[in-house]
Amino acid sequence: NDFIKKNYADYKSDFFSAFVIHASQMTKQSGYCGFFTPYVWMFIQSYEKMRNYLYNQATIETLIQFEYSAFEEATVPVCTFAFQNRHVQKKGCYLRLVDFRGGMEVQRQKTLEAIKNHDCGFYYEQNTDNFSIIPGSPVAYWASTKMLESFQTGNKFAGETKKGVLTGDNNTYLRLWHEVNIGKIGFELYSHAEMIDSSMKWFPVTSGGEKRRWYGNFDTIVNLENDGADIKANVKNYRLRDSQYYMLEAITWTEISSSIFTCRYVPKGILFGNGGPVSFFFNKKLMYHLALLNSKVAMEILGYLAPTINYGPEQINRIPIVYSNEDEVNQLTKWNILLSQTDWDSFETSWDFQHHPLLRKVPTIAEAFDQWQAECDDRFNQLKANEEELNRIFIDIYGLQDELIPEVEDKDVTVRKADLGRDIRSFISYAVGCMFGRYSLDVDGLAYAGGEWDASKYASFAADKDNIIPICDDEYFEDDIVGLFVEF
């Protein structure tokens, strides 16, 4: 390590990167070097100086990027490449085999196919001088001329992108919102000053979460009582900064995700956490940026900027923005947020949950489910149509008609369809909540979650008097869970 740091300080990210440079220095000018290495050097910031060395001091002649797990003997994704040890103006040949699963035999077959047929769809020719057009200079050999133009002429990303509250001890200071006394949660607070004045203990915070577009994944709270006094007194590696941004409107996403990149709208009143970075716009084109980030165009761009599973502020800030059709884009974005929020709030895990969607004025649960299913299908289909229209708009704006298609697969639409098993189980859960008084048929949202009991809220269905509900394998009690559910 000491030798590497002393002699190859700019290439110390890994032994292999220092060795590549060392091999180049040992090779005569115009000679050739070939390597089989992890492919992280092609994209990650810590290898940028290695990339620039190869661009300026050498010429990449060939490179094959293998499928993520193709080479079983390696524990990391790999590539193989060869370069001439001097810089000349010429295009290199690149094979992109990342989509072909099945091990090295499949990779071998695809390599031979590309050699015979350059129109196969995964063979590319690119001049390394073009790589510097993209911020960070990644080896984005498959970037088209139109895409490179967007980096040259596009506008700077308008948001201020940040990572937020880092407690240093999530097990102690983070909770799901329904795990604590709701009277101690600071909802509807819109600034750092209001947080302090509220005397509340818990506050909503972004936390990343599963693949979801437009709205949702809001279920986490953080203990910042007395401006985080407990964290400051007991934790060393915490980060509580940028308090001027607390509780502001923003866009958030999950920083580390093996799935597709998805963004969500954050309304005022929610803190920004470390696992859910945010971008603040201060009313400057937030809706437009949200639409772009959730489009296929952004996914294509992030393929160059963040081809690993990490979507940090640095990668997002490098996305080039081209403005057009703003009114139409903004209207579709607001519609999508509403559709996604309606879906999110239909389940108990949302703190804005009002009542169960199967609670309807129809004779049977079967009829209620049929209505709910129709609503879910309509919402799903509308959101899919809206997303495809936004894809069309951005594909046209960026001139990528020959590269991308607007269609969205059903698996990538992130509102939920009706599911009989799941929804009946959640209905039983809601019924149990009514039995214990947490919910009421006469009141939207939470009827009781601590504090003073108000019996007037339970006119239609009374909560269990002793708050004990037997669960038996047969009908032994009139007030067991089966009897109460039938009554419900």
Task: Locate predicted features.
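Signature of N6-adenine DNA methyltransferases within the class I
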Residues: 1-192, 217, 227, 233-234, ...
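Structural motif
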Residues: 11, 197, 284, 422-427
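Short Ser/Thr-interspersed hydrophobic loop/turn segments at strand-loop and sheet-helix junctions
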Residues: 244-262, 289-303
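Non-catalytic DNA-recognition/assembly elements of restriction-modification systems
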Residues: 138-143, 154, 169, 320-488
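Generic recognition of flexible, low-complexity loop/linker segments
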Residues: 22-23, 66-70, 189-194, 210, ...
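Active-site proximal loops enriched in glycine and acidic residues that flank catalytic Cys/His/Asp
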Residues: 37-39, 65-67, 207, 255-257, ...
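Contiguous C-terminal substrate-recognition/catalytic subdomains in enzyme active sites
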Residues: 180-181, 192-244, 252
